Amino acid sequence: MVRNTAGEVLFIFRNGKWDLPKGKTEKGENIEQTAVREVEEETGVTGLEITEFLLHTYHVFKRNGEYRLKLTHWYAMETEYNGVFAPQEDEGIMEVAWKDETATKEALLNSYENIKLLF
């Protein structure tokens, strides 16, 4: 979960829902490196600093007819970035936005249950 200097949270809009940037670890990466890389790739936001580990979440999804359990490691990050966003459209990301407390509450009404656990 990324916050800027104003305390706003970085959200992505993908598959008709507000979500937080995340992704899979690549060969040779540790989990913290993955977290930073995925935010940069999915949003264009740079200058990220991990401040703390938050929690793990789990969710079940179906791939090729089989159910799978996905573990996500969540970190708190901060940035002073105030540049232009670069949504990773080939990953289905249609919008990137900073959201204040009121807008975050609204976004969470159209989000995933595991994302709501972070707030």
Regions found by a protein language model. Name each.
Residues 1-21:
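N-terminal strand-loop-strand
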Residues 19-24, 97-98, 118:
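A short, polar/proline- and glycine-enriched secondary-structure boundary/capping micro-motif
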Residues 25-111:
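Unchanged
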Residues 1-2, 115-118:
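Short, intrinsically disordered, charge-balanced linker/junction segments flanking boundaries
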Residues 12, 118-119:
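Alpha-helix C-terminal capping segments
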Residues 17-19, 27, 113-114:
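Short, surface-exposed beta-strand-loop junctions and turns on beta-sheet-rich folds
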